[in-house]
C-alpha cells in the first residue's frame, strides 16, 4: 500500500479542484466535494456531505488526492515561516543530549540499560552480567531494526527466564499491530518464525519454551485473545488459551512479582476481571480470581505466597487487599479513603510502596511489613509529577522513583527506605537551561458550577508582565488520565519567547476517580466548560492577554479543542488539534471501528437515545456553526488506528464550508504515521516545531499572514 500512496501523493490534481495561480492558491483552500450521506438514528436524520472521505483501505484516489491537496495548501500557507520552524527545530535539537543512556538496573543476574547515539533516532538495548565491568552485549539495536521503514516502534522486549532467548514486538506502520520476532541471545540471526497480528503484549512462562501473547481482532483491532506459543514452532500451531466475547473489554498480559503467575487482564473502562495461569505449568487452564461485576475494578499482583489486590469493590475509590489464595476472603490492608486515589503499588520483601493521588498530586508512601511504620517521599515544587520507577528485584531496601516538574527536568532517584537517604541517579541534561530563570505555579479557578479547577503553569520570570503575555493552554480531560505537570525541554522555545504555558486539570482526568466520573458520559460537558473557564480564569488573574490566547490538545484532547472552538470561538486566537476525535456520534454508532465498543463507558452508546442526544450536543462535527473561528492547525496520520484519519479530514472540510471569515484552517496528514505521529526522537521534533511555529506565526501575523487582516 505504501508504494501506491507515494504515487498518489506525487501526482497532480485529478480534477477535483480548479487550477489556480500560486498567488491565488495561497488564499484559496481546497474545497472538498459534497456527496450527501444520510444517517438516521432515533428519528434524527444527519446529512454527512463528507462521509465519502472514509476509506478503510486507504487507497481511494479521490481521498488520497484530497489529503494531498490539503497537505500542499498547509505547506504553502506556512512556507513563509519555514525559517522560524527551522530555528525552533534547531533549538529543540540542541537541547537534546545526542549520546545518552538510561540508569542501569539489575534483573535476574544481569544489568540492563538503553542508550542513544548521536545522529540516530532509536534506542539500543544492552546488558551484561551483574557486577561485571566487561563489554555490554547488544540485545536490540532499534536503528538497525528500523532500516527501510517510514515508521518504527518497539512495543516490548522479553527475555526468557533462563536468559537465553529474546522476543521483541515491533510496529512498522503506526496502527499498534505488532509482529513478534525471536532470537537466541548468543546468535546474531533472527529466526524466521514470527507472530503476527498481536497487541505487542508478550510474557514468558517459566519453562523457557512457552510464550503467551495477545491477538487482535483483524477488523476492530481489539486485543481479545490470549494465545500460547511454543518457541521454535509455527504460529499456526499455537493454542488459544482465552477469548473475550464481550467487545467492550480489552485483554492484556502481565507476570506477577513472584513470577509464579501469568495474569490475564480483562478490562473495560469501569470493570475488570483477572484469570491466572500457573507460570510453572503453562499448559494448565486459567483460573478466575474473581468474576467480573459491573462497576467493580481490581488489579492483582502476587508475592511471597499471597495476592495483593488494588480494588474498588467496597468503595468508589480504591483500597489494597491481601488474599492468601484464590478462594480466601479479601482482607483490607489499606482502606479506601475519600479524596485519596490509590493508583499503584510495588512489592518488596520488607516493604510495601504505594502511589496515591490527592488533590491531583502524587504521593509515594513506604510501609514496613514488619513494623507498619510509614514514610512519605517529600517533593519541593508546588506542582509536579512523581512515579514509582522500575524496581524489578524485590529483595532490596532501596526504592527507585521518578520525579519531574515544570521547572525540574525528568529525574531518577533512589531512596534508602531504612534511612530515608536520597540519591539522584540521573537528571535529564538540557543545554543552557537554568531552573532559576523559570517560575511554576498552581492556581485554582472557579468553574461555572462553582467547582474549583486546578491549573499548573510555568513562565520565564524576566519576561513575565502581568496581563501582557501570550498564553497557551493545554488540556486532555478523558479516561481519568492525568496530564501531570512535568518538564518539557521543547516548551522552553515558547517560554523563552514570553509565553505562559498552562495545563488545565479539567474534569474527565487528572484529579482521580471522582474527578474522572464528573467528566465522562452524562457529565462530559463539564470537560469543555472547565477548559473555557480555566482559560478565562487565567486571563482574569493576569497570566495572559486577550487576543493572544492559544489552545492545544490531541486525541481526546483534540475532541476538547473541537468542542471549545464551537462553544467559545472568540476566546482563542489559534488552536492546535492533533489527531482529534471529532465525529463522536458517527464513530460511536459504528462497532466495526477500532476502539468504539470499548469506549461506551467513556462517552455512552448512541444506540441508546439518551446517550445519542447527549453526545450529539457536544460532538464537534455536529455542532459547527456559521460563525468566526480561531486559526486552527489540525494534524492526523493516515494509518491512525485510534482516531481514523477521516474524522479530522471531514471536520476540516465541513468547517471550511460553514465557518465565516478568513481565519486559517490547515490540515496536515502524515501519510506514513499513526496515532503517535512520526517515530524516532528526531523526527518527532519536526511535529513540535511545526506546532510551535504555527502559534508563533500567529503572534506576528503582520509578518507572516498580512492577508489575514
Task: Provide a role label for each language-model segment.
Residues 1-7:
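Positively charged n-region of N-terminal signal peptides that target proteins for export
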Residues 505-709:
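Active-site-proximal cap/loop segments of hydrolase catalytic domains
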Residues 116, 312, 404, 474-480, ...:
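Glycine-rich His-Gly loop
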Residues 301-302, 314, 346-348, 358-359, ...:
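A structural signal for short secondary-structure junctions
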Residues 138, 240, 421, 500, ...:
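Conserved beta-strand segments of alpha/beta enzyme cores
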Residues 143-157, 169-175, 189-191, 402, ...:
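Cap/lid segment of the alpha/beta-hydrolase catalytic domain
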Residues 7-13, 17-398, 402-410, 414-419, ...:
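Beta-propeller folds
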Residues 154, 196-202, 217-221, 246, ...:
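Alpha-helix capping and helix-loop boundary segments enriched in small/acidic/polar residues
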Amino acid at each position: 500500500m505504501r508504494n501506491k500512496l507515494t504515487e498518489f501523493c506525487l501526482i497532480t490534481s485529478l480534477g477535483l479542484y480548479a487550477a489556480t495561480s500560486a498567488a491565488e492558491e495561497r488564499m484559496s483552500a481546497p474545497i472538498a466535494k459534497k456527496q450527501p450521506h444520510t444517517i438516521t438514528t432515533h428519528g434524527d436524520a444527519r446529512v454527512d456531505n463528507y462521509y465519502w472521505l472514509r476509506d478503510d483501505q486507504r487507497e481511494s484516489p479521490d481521498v488520497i488526492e484530497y489529503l494531498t491537496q490539503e497537505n500542499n495548501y498547509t505547506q504553502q500557507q506556512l512556507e513563509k515561516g519555514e525559517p522560524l520552524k527551522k530555528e525552533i527545530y534547531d533549538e529543540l535539537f540542541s537541547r537534546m543530549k545526542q549520546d545518552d543512556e538510561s540508569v542501569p538496573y539489575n534483573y535476574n543476574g544481569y544489568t540492563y540499560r538503553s542508550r542513544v547515539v548521536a545522529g540516530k533516532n532509536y534506542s539500543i538495548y544492552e546488558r551484561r552480567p551483574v557486577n561485571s565491568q566487561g563489554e555490554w552485549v547488544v540485545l536490540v539495536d532499534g536503528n538497525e531494526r528500523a532500516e527501510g521503514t517510514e515508521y518504527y516502534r518497539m512495543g516490548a522486549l522479553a527475555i526468557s527466564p533462563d536468559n537465553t532467548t529474546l522476543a521483541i514486538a515491533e510496529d512498522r506502520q503506526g496502527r499498534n499491530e505488532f509482529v513478534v520476532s525471536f532470537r537466541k541471545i548468543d546468535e546474531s540471526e533472527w529466526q524466521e518464525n514470527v507472530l503476527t497480528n498481536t497487541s505487542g503484549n508478550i510474557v514468558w512462562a517459566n519453562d523457557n519454551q512457552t510464550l503467551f501473547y495477545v491477538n487482535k481482532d483483524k477488523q476492530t483491532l481489539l486485543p481479545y485473545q490470549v494465545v500460547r506459543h511454543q518457541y521454535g514452532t509455527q504460529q499456526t500451531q499455537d493454542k488459544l488459551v482465552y477469548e473475550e466475547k464481550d467487545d467492550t473489554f480489552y485483554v492484556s498480559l502481565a507476570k506477577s512479582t513472584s513470577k509464579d503467575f501469568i495474569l490475564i487482564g480483562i478490562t473495560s473502562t469501569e470493570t475488570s476481571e483477572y484469570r491466572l495461569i500457573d507460570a510453572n505449568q503453562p499448559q494448565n487452564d486459567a483460573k478466575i480470581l474473581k468474576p467480573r461485576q459491573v462497576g467493580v475494578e481490581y488489579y492483582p499482583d502476587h508475592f511471597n505466597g499471597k495476592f495483593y489486590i488494588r480494588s474498588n469493590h467496597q468503595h468508589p475509590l480504591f483500597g489494597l487487599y491481601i488474599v492468601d489464595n484464590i478462594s480466601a476472603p479479601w482482607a483490607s490492608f489499606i482502606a479506601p479513603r475519600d479524596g485519596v486515589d490509590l493508583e499503584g503499588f510495588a512489592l518488596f520483601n520488607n516493604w510495601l510502596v504505594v502511589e496515591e493521588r490527592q488533590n491531583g498530586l502524587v504521593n509515594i508512601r513506604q510501609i514496613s511489613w514488619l513494623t507498619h511504620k510509614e514514610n512519605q517521599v517529600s517533593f519541593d515544587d508546588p506542582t509536579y509529577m512523581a512515579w514509582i520507577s522500575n524496581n524489578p528485584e524485590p529483595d532490596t531496601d532501596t526504592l527507585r522513583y521518578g520525579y519531574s516538574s515544570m521547572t525540574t527536568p525528568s529525574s531518577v532517584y533512589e531512596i534508602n527506605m531504612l534511612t530515608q537517604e536520597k540519591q539522584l541517579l540521573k537528571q535529564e541534561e538540557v543545554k543552557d537551561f537554568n531552573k532559576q530563570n523559570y517560575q511554576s505555579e498552581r492556581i485554582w479557578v472557579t468553574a461555572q458550577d462553582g467547582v474549583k479547577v486546578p491549573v499548573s503553569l510555568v513562565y520565564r520570570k524576566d519576561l513575565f508582565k502581568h496581563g501582557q503575555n501570550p498564553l497557551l493552554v493545554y488540556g486532555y480531560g478523558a479516561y481519568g488520565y492525568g496530564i501531570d505537570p512535568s518538564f518539557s525541554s521543547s516548551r522552553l522555545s515558547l517560554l523563552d519567547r514570553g509565553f505562559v504555558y498552562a495545563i488545565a486539570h479539567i474534569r474527565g482526568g487528572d484529579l482521580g476517580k471522582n474527578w474522572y466520573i464528573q467528566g465522562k458520559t452524562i457529565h462530559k460537558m463539564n470537560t469543555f466548560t472547565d477548559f473555557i473557564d480555566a482559560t478565562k480564569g487565567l486571563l482574569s488573574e493576569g497570566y495572559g492577554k486577550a487576543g493572544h490566547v492559544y489552545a492545544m490538545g490531541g486525541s481526546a484532547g483534540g475532541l476538547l479543542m473541537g468542542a471549545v472552538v464551537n462553544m467559545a470561538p472568540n476566546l482563542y486566537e489559534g488552536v492546535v488539534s492533533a489527531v482529534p476525535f471529532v465525529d463522536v456520534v458517527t464513530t460511536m454508532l459504528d462497532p466495526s471501528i477500532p476502539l468504539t465498543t470499548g469506549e461506551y463507558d467513556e462517552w455512552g452508546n448512541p444506540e441508546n437515545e439518551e446517550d445519542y442526544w447527549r453526545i450529539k450536543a457536544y460532538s464537534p462535527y455536529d455542532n459547527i456553526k456559521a460563525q468566526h473561528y480561531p486559526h486552527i492547525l489540525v494534524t492526523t496520520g493516515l494509518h491512525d488506528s485510534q482516531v481514523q484519519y477521516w474524522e479530522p479530514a471531514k471536520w476540516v472540510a465541513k468547517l471550511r464550508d460553514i465557518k465565516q471569515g478568513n481565519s486559517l484552517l490547515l490540515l496536515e496528514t502524515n501519510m506514513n504515521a499513526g496515532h503517535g505521529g512520526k517515530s524516532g526522537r528526531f523526527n518527532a521534533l519536526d511535529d513540535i516545531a511545526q506546532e510551535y511555529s504555527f502559534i508563533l506565526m500567529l503572534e506576528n501575523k503582520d509578518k507572516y499572514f498580512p492577508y489575514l487582516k
